[in-house]
Amino acid sequence: MKTPVSHFLTTISALLTIGIQPAAAQPFEAVGMRALGMGGAFVAVANDSSATWWNPAGLATGPFLDLALTRASGESGDALPASRTGLWSFSLGTPPLGVSYYRLRITDIRATSPTAPAEAGREDRAAGVGIRSLSVSQFGATVLHTITTGVSAGATVKYLRGTAHVRDLDGTDAAGAIADLLDEGDDLSGGDGEGAVDIDVGVLAAMGAVRVGVTARNLREPSFSGRRLERQVRAGAAFDAAAAGGLPLTVSLDVDLRRYAAATGDRRVVAFGGEHWVRPQRVALRGGARFNTAGEQDRTVTAGASVAVRAALFVDGYGAVGAKTGESGWGVAARVSF
């Protein structure tokens, strides 16, 4: 008879055998104000409705109901290649089910000349830049299954509708400010939408104060006009001091188990963070950092907070600032949780 630990390890092993191919990515660090305030170290923590994105199994440890409306934006734009991700989302979790809608706009620009330097200036960009923008609407349904006491598995089956937009610029048009070029990419319209069905899966083991999880996203790697949403696998661990009779403090660590291609280069992220409810169920503070161990090896520091404006109604927010690629981000959400 298998123990809970062996069940958990068997599931992890199955996820790790999934092959990865380099492609454009839909970033983990696009969704969830709590997650982003903690630097993106959330796979083992995910217990609100953003678990529909971060780790479907996390809903098993969540409240009776969690509902969030979110607006967020992230950008890496000091030099080429540069990118921006914008998000509007609705998510709802009420174990053992969840539903979600994520609307993302992923825009990137890069020099079209193969000889252009990585930190291309305006003169270098005058030779030409390519602008790519992918708008994706994702509708998801999340279901849970209890493997054994303290160990759950979850899956989000999702329908995606995506439209890719491409434009090449040269001369003075290409030499504009990077922020203006990203704005132009965000404004691209037209094109034919394409639909695809995909699935995210995850497992979570919660044993006392210790939580361990692993999740795999975009298993079928859908593509839209040649832009593929790359499969990603991430593992996380967390310690919940309150569950051990201590402070209402959670610390966490996440690690990408495979590198993946993003607009600004290859990524393989290590993230850590913490969440402290300085006034339980009223005020929470968060902080974290993440490091890219591949590609540009950029570093990003994040902070966030939640404030209850009335019982069970929270306003969540976060901000991020980074080095190397000039990454920055912000987000705000209204969340009902009880």
Q: Which role does the model predict for each range below?
A:
Residues 21-106, 220, 292:
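N-terminal, post-signal peptide beta-strand-biased segments of exported outer-membrane/organellar beta-barrel
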Residues 50, 82-88, 93, 135-139, ...:
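Residues that define the transmembrane beta-barrel architecture of outer-membrane proteins
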Residues 50, 54-60, 89-93, 100, ...:
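Transmembrane beta-barrel domains of outer membrane proteins
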Residues 102, 107-144:
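A gly/proline- and charged-residue-enriched helix-loop-helix capping module
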Residues 109-120, 169-178, 229-233, 305, ...:
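Flexible, surface-exposed loop regions and adjacent strand-edge segments
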Residues 124-129, 183-190, 221-225, 259-260, ...:
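Extracellular loop and loop/strand-boundary signature of outer-membrane beta-barrel proteins
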Residues 170-225:
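Loop-centered beta-sheet repeat module
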Residues 204, 209-216, 223-338:
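Outer membrane beta-barrel transmembrane domains
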